């Protein structure tokens, strides 16, 4: 009886799905048919799910307590715990490798022959290995180029270079999708200078490429057309993860979900327990118990252990798939190398930011357009040009009224000691008002000095970007995803790399509506 009822329910569900799909062939608001060239050819795309880009892992989002989970031993007070929500997104399974970055450099040198400075600007700073009282010249010469290190994470890359890599990767992945779908041919010899595949330039009609085929156009005035964003063929942009996304993915609390919406064990690290060694046999081999889970510095002068019994097996960064992945399947979210995130650093961001998709660093831009309102000609590197939104364009908006919102609530004139000074409101993008208020003057010796009682300075400004995760030079304290540090966006370190992320469109869970 139950079996017959079950079959009947399945049959009814099948009919519902069939008829609902038929209904979607006609507009529910106008009654006009979709995808019918007889009435103009408006297209309805039967989209299933977002394709997972190369190297990415789906991170199902949700709510979590962002911030420190252990004692603030440095008394920085800049990571107060706060509950926030992160949308589902994609994250690289591993840190970007040396071989990945060399592939990027090879493409730049091959395509931008007339602009060698583009290649030079993208080169990682291999001199970060140098220490005044250490002999690290072999790493300066070999770490980035030698094939022995090609599976190791790239270091010496600053925040700006990491963002440029993400943009390049977006275009290469989408170009390959176009080739795979039979719409373009690979054209390595034809792509030089500005004539290279750029996703935005293609969508704006400013790149043709080696066309293999086109999509049929249901517009009765045309026979064929190029791919549009509405087709769902091209992927969203690769980018750096936000600080909240990175921390959420690193903790991997989905692995501690023992009941519906109940997580009984908070995590200090991307794994359970209070130690960086494996202290539980569940899910591990007996021989794994006692092994160190991450590439870190165990103590003063101890980067790898003793000969014959190396503790983390690496004296410098190790291969990106070293150690055990967390519950999202991500490798080295603690240790190996620190990782850049997208956020501008402020001590109180955790208190000020929104509780949905928190982020500090928004500078709103719009595409440059000509006098007729069309998208302006792309630049010499084949990219669509952007400019900051003007205050006039943002006037009367409720959600923002200026382009640069980096200083909002923490660095703008309202949050400074000059909040009642009308002159101070003229430049709201200068964080020195809040964090570097010392006013210099020329002293008696003719050298710049500070006025008495006015000597407050700070390293914090709009160029300071957050990095997280701890690296091979760090103690266990920095392995906790809730810890945070900052560095100028044009500086780099020998223990700092990055990985990419991507927004997920549609449903929060893959394959489930």
Where do the protein language model's features map onto the residues?
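C-terminal motif of bacterial Sec signal peptides marking the signal peptidase cleavage site
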Residues: 19-21
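A short glycine-rich, aromatic-capped structural motif
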Residues: 48-137, 150-173, 335, 504
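Short beta-strand-to-coil "C-cap" segments at the C-terminal boundary of structured domains/repeats
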Residues: 500-507
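Short, P/G- and charge-enriched loop/turn segments at secondary-structure junctions
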Residues: 44-46, 76-79, 454, 484-489
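Bacterial N-terminal signal peptides that target proteins for export
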Residues: 2-9
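Post-signal peptide N-terminal segment of mature Sec-exported envelope proteins
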Residues: 30-58
């Amino acid at each position: 009886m139950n079996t017959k009822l079950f079959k009947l329910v399945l049959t009814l569900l099948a009919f519902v799905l069939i008829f609902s799909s038929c209904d979607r062939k006609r507009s529910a608001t106008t009654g006009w048919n979709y995808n019918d060239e007889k009435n103009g050819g408006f297209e309805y795309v039967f989209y299933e799910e977002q394709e997972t880009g190369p190297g990415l892992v789906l991170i199902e989002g949700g709510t979590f307590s962002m911030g420190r989970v252990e004692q603030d031993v440095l008394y920085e007070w800049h990571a107060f715990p706060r509950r926030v929500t992160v949308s589902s997104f994609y994250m690289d399974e591993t840190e970007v490798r040396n071989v990945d970055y060399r592939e990027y450099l090879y493409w730049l040198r091959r395509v931008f022959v007339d602009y060698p400075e583009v290649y030079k600007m993208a080169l990682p700073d291999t001199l970060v290995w140098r220490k005044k009282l250490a002999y690290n010249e072999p790493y300066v010469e070999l770490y980035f180029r030698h094939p022995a290190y090609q599976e190791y994470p790239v270091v010496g890359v600053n925040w700006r270079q990491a963002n440029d890599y993400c943009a390049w990767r977006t275009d290469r992945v989408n170009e390959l999708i176009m080739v795979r779908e039979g719409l373009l041919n690979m054209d390595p010899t034809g792509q030089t200078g500005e004539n290279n595949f750029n996703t935005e330039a293609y969508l704006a009609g400013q790149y043709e490429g080696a066309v293999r085929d086109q999509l049929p156009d249901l517009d009765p005035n045309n026979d064929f057309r190029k791919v549009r964003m509405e087709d769902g063929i091209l992927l969203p942009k690769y980018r750096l993860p936000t600080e909240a996304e990175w921390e959420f993915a690193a903790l991997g609390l989905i692995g501690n979900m023992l009941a519906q919406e109940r997580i009984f064990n908070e995590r200090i690290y991307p794994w359970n327990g209070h130690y960086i060694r494996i202290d539980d046999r569940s899910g591990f081999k007996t021989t794994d118990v006692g092994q160190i889970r991450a590439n870190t510095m165990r103590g003063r002068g101890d980067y790898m252990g003793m000969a014959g019994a190396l503790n983390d097996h690496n004296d410098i960064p190790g291969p990106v798939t070293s150690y055990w992945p967390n519950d999202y399947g991500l490798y080295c979210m603690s240790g190996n190398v620190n990782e850049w995130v997208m956020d501008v650093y402020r001590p109180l961001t955790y208190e000020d930011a929104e509780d949905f998709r928190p982020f500090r660093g928004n500078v709103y831009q719009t595409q440059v357009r000509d006098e007729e309102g069309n998208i302006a000609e792309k630049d010499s590197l084949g990219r669509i040009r952007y400019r900051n939104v003007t205050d006039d364009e943002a006037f009367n908006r409720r959600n923002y009224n200026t382009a640069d919102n980096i200083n909002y609530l923490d660095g703008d004139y309202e949050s400074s000691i000059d909040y009642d000074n009308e002159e101070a409101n003229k430049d709201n993008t200068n964080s020195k008002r809040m964090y570097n208020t010392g006013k210099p003057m020329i002293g008696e010796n003719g050298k710049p000095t500070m006025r008495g009682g006015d000597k407050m300075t700070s390293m914090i400004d709009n160029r300071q970007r957050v990095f997280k995760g701890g690296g091979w030079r760090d103690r266990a304290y920095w392995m906790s995803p809730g810890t945070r540090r900052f560095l100028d966006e044009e500086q780099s370190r020998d223990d700092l790399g990055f990985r990419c992320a991507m927004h997920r469109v549609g449903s929060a869970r893959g394959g489930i509506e």
